[in-house]
Amino acid sequence: IGDWLLGMNATRLYTLKYGQNRQVLSIGRVQTPTLALIVNRQKEIDSFEPEPYWVLSTIYRDTLFTATKGKFTTKEEGEQAFATIADKPFEVTNVSKKNGNEAPPRLFDLTSLQVECNRKFSYSAEMTLNLIQSLYERKLTTYPRVDTQFLSDDIYPKCAGILTGMRGYEQYIQPLAGKKLPKSKRVFDTSKVTDHHAIIPTGVPASALSDMERNVYDLIARRFIAVFYPDCKFSTTTVLGKVEDVEFKVSGKEILEPGWRTIYAQQQTSTPQPNNPQPSSSEDDDKRDEERTLPTFVKGESGPHTPTLTEKWTTPPKYYTEATLLRAMETAGKFVDDETLRAALKENGIGRPSSRAGIIETLFKRHYIRRERKNLIATATGIELIDIIHEELLKSCELTGIWEKKLRDIEHKKYEAADFINELKQQVTEIVYDVLRDNSNRRVTITTDEDLKKAKKKKTAAPKKAAAKSAATSSTASTKNAAASPQPATSEPSADDSIIGTTCPVCGKGTIIKGKTAYGCSNWKNGCTYRVAFK
């Protein structure tokens, strides 16, 4: 009733006050803070001013070492450090190895499945929900609208039978045959399961699936098999070195026993990622560096090296994608300062797994946001709506935190439900009077379908401009005693992922899928010739 009271009154209020030409300005406890996340991120990007910095590195024995000092904020400081190490020998000061284990990724709940499908296949949250719902209705996977990544203990005796029924995965299931399946607390924990457990296969043989359904089923199947495999064992090597007083470092990672990673070894795409925000490009580079295998170094060895001082530029935050937005909604407590409210949001964030896809789709339908490749871009309508909302609480995740806390207090009989409703009515009344006191004639811009089409056409020219800008502002290297190799400028073919999953216009049977350089039809094996190259 709380969502209805707030949404019904606030939507009518803002529509009548600031809408135009039958435009509906919908307001909601989850919808509006979600839009605010996108708008605020976009404003951060628009106002971002890149700043130069310099990184000192050197190549010793075909291995790139980076100065441990990090970034130099002035070129003079970097050149001074460069001059210190020029023509001086590089010495290895320490070599350390540390073995570690990497546990299999957790089973899927709905949000993590939507995140993975968006990251890997560019499927929207709504599209993934529809696909997994289809698999569930065909009894191939379990109930999908779940918010847990655990199984209850009573599922354990059924797991061997489920694995046996999974056709097409025999090469991965065979090593588990005849053995007692491990029962890990990372997988089986009844205390963390409410009405439904994590999404897993049912053991019913999967046949006659579309390509998109097969992709989703394959993610679930491999994840289920992987949890019964041993940990991946690896060794991390860290090598420290110095030239004069300047210290350098490089790290490498060697897989000793792949364990569960065997399940993903033949896939061209990357193995599952941890549940964390999308890393920046520099973090991506660091991750790739750490995963490389290093040559053998010995403490005390020394020799010539090739130093490089590289100019780089700070980069703006990344636009939200559906994957990162879903994670932000799930972990919305991090946007709240009040510790009590943050704790209330910790368990569920804003929205429920089953409703988040619908919330995002509503933002699209209202023309508050649009897609640009994978990125979510706020339209003029979305930006102006957030700017015009008077009550900051309506735009904040704190509102959900306040409600969650009060609902828990009601559950523990510390607070009366009637008081909650009365307070909510009072809050809505204050919101109404606050807006009515605005004597301006402001109106929120209407973003039409034609506006979205123009934006789509405009961005097709963007890759060329971006490439030119990138070439003009690319990192420059200042080297002495050695010339740096120029890096060729590259650009990816641009793509419009919004057509993925739509019905093929040629055969009418398949759906549009995304390849490396073009879109095609999932029915291509049966002769459909539909193909559209990326622009």
Where are these regions (language model features)?
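Short amphipathic alpha-helical face segments that pack within enzyme cores
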Residues: 33-34, 112, 130, 219, ...
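Positively charged, polyanion-binding regions of nucleic-acid-associated proteins
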Residues: 87-103, 306-315
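Conserved short loop/turn motifs at secondary-structure junctions
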Residues: 21-24, 97-106, 115-121, 144-152, ...
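Phosphate-backbone binding and catalysis cores of DNA-processing enzymes
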Residues: 1-99, 193-249, 254, 258
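C-terminal accessory/connector segments of nucleic-acid motor ATPases
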Residues: 48-65, 91-131, 321, 341
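Secretory-pathway/luminal and periplasmic proteins that interact with or process carbohydrate-rich
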Residues: 138-144
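Basic, low-complexity terminal or inter-domain segments flanking catalytic cores
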Residues: 47, 125-126, 147-535
